[in-house]
């Protein structure tokens, strides 16, 4: 718990992103000090409600403290208007570099443009801000490779032909959801074409199953039908609805493309209690602590480990290079609909029960005491 009074109300409740300054009148004059940021880096993350972003906050704080910088980290709580207000707040503090994970890639374009107009270098972090030339750099995991790793896991576990395949995706407002699904489709489509899998829960995907490459519009058609909106309850409700209309023949031993760990757990909970489901293989992403426990317990099959420490360090590397007047290292580029954004990409690792200790415990990412049932 934190004691809050007039002396720290701004730091505790506004700077943390819990509220915005616009929610109140007569805030103390300390609400936007332009000198408070050493290194002049501001960070805007999308929500505190997903463990992944709380992890990122912690890693940023630790890494920047170790590097001798202070940082202001604000959360937008899934609200593009609050996101814009957060960016404007940081601009008034005199930041020179903005690291931002957009809630909605298109909607964040206005915030990026405002930062750019103020002379701020904009680094899109993990999710790409779309349809604007105001993005300078993109720091990300190889999102297509994430989807390919998820799909390859399903392929490797499948035997014979005629295996039921259930498809789920992230939020249609998130460019990464398109990249994840694109990567998965790269691997799954040939195995759908040869009969290894058949699609159960998406008529849009069935209509396009003979196409090896999908346009953005075609991806949008599929994602619009199978979106979880990155939300646990939405994912569980959708999975339950799919199972309600599925035949017994569409159950048995099933294969499930789930886009991330939160949705994977939700979908696993739904499939796990259906008496007609004999077994399921379900993918995930982010190596959230709860999903690691699910993997240990045999309730989630795998996760794609995206070491936040690496991504945070890459973002800081780009930010520091900018602050020191250097050109940051990049390894590729992503088209955001307006320009090709120079990108620094981090590697991903497939984790399941066979390597969970080596990948996540021995690496120091988690402690063995965080889990039960480890061998």
Descriptions of predicted regions:
Residues 1-375:
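A residue-level marker of the well-folded mature domains of exported/periplasmic proteins
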């Amino acid at each position: 718990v934190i004691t809050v009074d007039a002396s720290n109300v701004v730091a505790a409740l506004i700077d943390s992103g819990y509220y915005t300054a616009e929610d109140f009148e007569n805030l103390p004059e300390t609400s936007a000090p332009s000198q408070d940021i050493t290194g002049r880096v501001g960070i805007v993350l999308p929500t505190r409600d997903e463990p992944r972003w709380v992890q990122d906050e912690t890693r940023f704080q630790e890494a920047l403290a170790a590097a001798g910088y202070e940082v202001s980290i604000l959360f937008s709580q899934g609200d593009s208007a609050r996101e814009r207000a957060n960016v404007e707040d940081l601009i008034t503090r005199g930041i020179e570099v903005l690291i931002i994970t957009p809630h909605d890639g298109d909607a964040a374009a206005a915030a990026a443009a405002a930062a750019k107009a103020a002379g701020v270098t904009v680094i899109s972090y993990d999710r790409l801000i779309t349809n604007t030339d105001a993005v300078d750099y993109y720091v990300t995991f190889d999102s297509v490779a994430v989807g390919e790793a998820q799909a390859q896991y399903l392929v490797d576990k499948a035997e014979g032909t005629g295996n039921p395949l259930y498809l789920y995706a992230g939020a249609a407002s998130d460019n990464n959801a398109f990249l994840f699904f694109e990567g998965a489709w790269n691997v799954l489509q040939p195995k759908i074409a040869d009969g290894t899998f058949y699609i159960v829960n998406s008529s849009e995907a069935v209509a396009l199953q003979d196409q090896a490459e999908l346009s953005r519009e075609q991806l949008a058609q599929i994602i619009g039908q199978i979106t979880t909106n990155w939300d646990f309850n939405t994912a569980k409700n959708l999975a339950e609805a799919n199972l309600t209309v599925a035949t017994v023949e569409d159950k048995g031993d099933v294969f499930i493309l789930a886009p991330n760990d939160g949705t994977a757990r939700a979908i696993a909970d739904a499939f796990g209690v259906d008496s007609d489901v004999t077994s399921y293989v379900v993918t995930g992403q982010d190596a959230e602590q709860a999903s690691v426990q699910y993997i240990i317990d045999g309730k989630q099959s795998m996760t794609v480990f995206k070491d936040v420490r690496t991504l945070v360090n890459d973002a800081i590397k780009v930010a520091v290079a900018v602050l020191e007047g250097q050109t940051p290292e990049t390894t590729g580029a992503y088209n955001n609909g307006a320009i090709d954004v120079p990108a620094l990409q981090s590697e991903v690792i497939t984790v399941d029960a066979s390597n969970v200790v080596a990948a996540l415990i021995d690496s120091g990412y988690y402690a063995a005491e965080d889990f039960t049932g480890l061998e």
